[in-house]
Regions:
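Conserved Nudix-box catalytic region and its N-terminal flanking loop in Nudix hydrolases
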Residues: 2-4, 39-42, 47-92
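Short beta-strand micro-motifs in enzyme catalytic cores
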Residues: 20-24, 34, 70, 121-123, ...
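Acidic, metal-coordinating catalytic segment for phosphate/diphosphate chemistry
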Residues: 10-47, 52-53
Length: 167
């Protein structure tokens, strides 16, 4: 370790709605070259652990095409732009997806979701003192809001029924 691996070429292979896929040519410390795939998530994302006054955690259930099934997750979404503060994103996604808002949102952690080949990050926040409003789902979203006890959520995680990394 210690010697650098250097990218000597980057070729855009696909440009999608929220991500770009590149083929990188990398020079290894031994002088050989290899091609590596790289996925650039253009905007980053935010998620929020929202806890009601009764101690229940707000979760969203939605269909995920990549898994071909519904998942149970904390509310989350991509930033509207690369300059949007992720705290703003978290607050917006909380209200859009759950129909709750909060003025008490604090930063928890920044997650790098797939460090081997992707630069996506998700900043996770904690929200309390929730106020009920209305869901404002995007046209393509079909989200059910559920309130869970933390112990029950932990049980689902240990049983492998919640597999979403940010959750």
């Amino acid at each position: 370790m210690g010697e650098q691996i250097t990218r000597i070429k980057r070729e855009l292979v696909h440009s999608g709605t929220i991500l770009d896929i590149y083929k990188d040519t990398m020079e290894l410390p031994n002088g050989k070259t290899e091609e590596w795939d790289f996925v650039s998530h253009r905007k980053g994302a935010a998620a929020v652990v929202a806890v009601r006054e009764d101690g229940k955690v707000l979760m969203v259930r939605q269909y995920r095409p990549s898994l071909e099934r519904e998942t149970l997750e904390i509310p989350a979404g991509a930033r509207d732009s690369v300059t949007e503060d992720t705290k703003v994103t978290a607050a917006r996604e909380l209200e859009e997806e759950t129909g709750y808002r909060s003025d008490k949102i604090g930063f928890l952690i920044s997650l790098k979701t797939t460090v081997a080949f992707c630069d996506e990050f998700v900043d996770v926040y904690f929200a309390r003192d929730l106020v009920k409003t209305e869901q404002h789902l995007d046209d393509a979203e079909d989200i059910a809001v559920e309130a869970w006890d933390l112990d029950d959520l932990c049980d689902l995680i240990y049983k492998g029924r919640i597999q979403d990394a940010k959750t």
